Amino acid sequence: MRHPDFPVPPRIDAFASWEASLRLAFARRGGRTVLASCRHRGPLRVQKALYPEGEGVCHVVLLHPPAGIAGGDVLDIGIELGAEAHAVLTTPGATKWYKSPGRTAMQQVAIRLDAGARLDWLPQENIVFNQARPVIDLTLDLAPGAAAIGWDITMLGRHAAGESWQEGRIAMHTRLRCEGQPLWIESTAFDAQSPVLGATTGMAGFHVVGTLWAVGAGATEALAETLAEQLPYRDDLRAGVTCLTQDAPGRPSVLLLRVLARRPEDARALLSQTWLALREPIHGVAGRPLRLWAT
């Protein structure tokens, strides 16, 4: 059953062949962030809680043992961070979206942060196979005083294997909210023949796209301007950054960085570097490279 407090969108594929769900709850107990609750159904798991930064920050790796998502599959993830908790969540490798002519596969993630909670959401890239039809959905709801940094990276086609993305469709939906009120909402959907892939206002012929978002009191226009001075604009890697300020008092601003790349490694390296630079102004903690990715 879905947690009633998680704003998880309804399943859209009536022919789902494999459903998996995962529910995580983090809590602050004294000076320690703990994984207070973990429930799963189907092939979604987590490794044990790790503390490479000390007891205040809990690191967890999300595991999907099949290593790929096929047509009809639905992965349903709900995460809650209690007041003042700080969690870092990542994946051990790329998420592969397999060929599935005519059938949609879906991953939906709903995250809720209570007052003062801090989140680092750092999944590795999505790899969209030819003829895949993924729907990738993320909803993040923050209480006042909470902060979050996260990203998504998607590669269309398996170019290292000589396979381009010639057929299929992708839909990506992201909702960032504070107390249920929208801070930033983006919905993108196109097929493999869409002109957006080649348009200068779209992906400009690149096949890797990534977006980093940072939400919190430290997300300022001045910070965006500082980052902009260091971003590349080359034939193989391009990036830009902006800050969405909020009119309503008490609502956090959103810093957005977009990257286009030829290789997912380059996009991930740029977003990782940016994440390290953002941790101090957004979370008030030092940026440290993820040890999980070095093992």
UniProtKB/Swiss-Prot annotation:
Chaperone listed as a keyword: yes
Domain of life: Bacteria
Keywords per UniProt: Chaperone, Cytoplasm, Nickel insertion
Main location: cytoplasm
GO CC annotation, single: cytoplasm
Localization terms from the record: Cytoplasm
Pfam families membership: UreD (PF01774)
A GO molecular function held by the record: nickel cation binding
Subunit structure and binding partners: UreD, UreF and UreG form a complex that acts as a GTP-hydrolysis-dependent molecular chaperone, activating the urease apoprotein by helping to assemble the nickel containing metallocenter of UreC. The UreE protein probably delivers the nickel.
Function noted in UniProt: Required for maturation of urease via the functional incorporation of the urease nickel metallocenter.
Entry similarity comment: Belongs to the UreD family.
Name of this chain's protein: Urease accessory protein UreD
Biological source species: Ralstonia nicotianae (strain ATCC BAA-1114 / GMI1000)
